[in-house]
């Protein structure tokens, strides 16, 4: 049996451990640059894209991959999104900007046309121009039928709400549980 010096054994062991630890890590791609030494201590939040409006909850949910949604009585509040005042402002015709141009799902989500048509930029158009840009009704009767249908649905909903309020609730027993 050949006797090896203890120093060589520890160097070989350290080299094997270092190679084994680095085995599962992926190399950096051009889309994901190597983080700077300063940023290694902070958590980098993965984002698929960056939304133009914080009020667009669907966009925020789609773009920010590691947000935590907390249900509050008034609204659903996203946490972990950074500092909104530092965010670069963008024009509204685009819903969001994709981090990678090679992501077709993101490009479809951010640049699809129906969302841009549905958003009205305050002060950009008069209400008449906004109404004309939407769907034009072929006849006044069609518009009237749509409004009547909406009104009937609202009345049915209000009646159900009133019935639910008036419905007798079972009274709790007066006996204490042990």
Swiss-Prot record:
GO molecular function terms noted in the UniProt entry: endothelin B receptor binding; hormone activity
> Where are the stretches annotated Disordered?
25-45
The region called Endothelin-like is annotated at: 96-111
* Entry's transmembrane regions: none
Instruction: Check the record and name the SMART domains matching this protein.
Output: END
Q: Which domain of life is it from?
A: Eukaryota
Write the signal peptide boundaries. 1-24
Tell me where it mainly resides: secreted
Keywords, in A-Z order: Cleavage on pair of basic residues, Disulfide bond, Secreted, Signal, Vasoactive, Vasoconstrictor
In the record, biological process GO terms are: intracellular calcium ion homeostasis; positive regulation of smooth muscle contraction; regulation of systemic arterial blood pressure by endothelin; regulation of vasoconstriction; vein smooth muscle contraction
Enumerate the PROSITE patterns for this protein.
Answer: ENDOTHELIN
> Which PANTHER family does the record cross-reference, listed alphabetically?
ENDOTHELIN, ENDOTHELIN-2
Q: What is this protein called?
A: Endothelin-2
């Amino acid at each position: 049996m050949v006797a090896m010096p203890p120093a060589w054994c520890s160097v070989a062991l350290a080299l094997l451990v270092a190679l084994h630890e680095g085995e599962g890590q992926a190399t950096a791609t051009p889309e994901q640059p190597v983080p700077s030494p300063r940023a290694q201590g902070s958590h980098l939040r993965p984002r698929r894209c960056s939304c133009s409006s914080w009020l667009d909850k669907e966009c925020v949910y789609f773009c920010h991959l590691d947000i935590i949604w907390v249900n509050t009585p008034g609204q659903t509040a996203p946490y972990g999104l950074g500092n909104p005042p530092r965010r670069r402002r963008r024009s509204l015709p685009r819903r969001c900007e994709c981090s990678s141009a090679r992501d077709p799902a993101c490009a479809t989500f951010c640049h699809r046309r129906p969302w841009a048509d549905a958003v009205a930029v305050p002060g950009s158009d008069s209400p008449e121009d906004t109404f004309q840009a939407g769907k034009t009704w072929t006849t006044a009767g069609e518009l009237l039928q749509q409004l009547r249908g909406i009104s009937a649905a609202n009345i049915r909903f209000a009646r159900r709400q009133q019935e639910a309020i008036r419905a007798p609730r079972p009274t709790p027993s007066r006996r204490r549980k042990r």
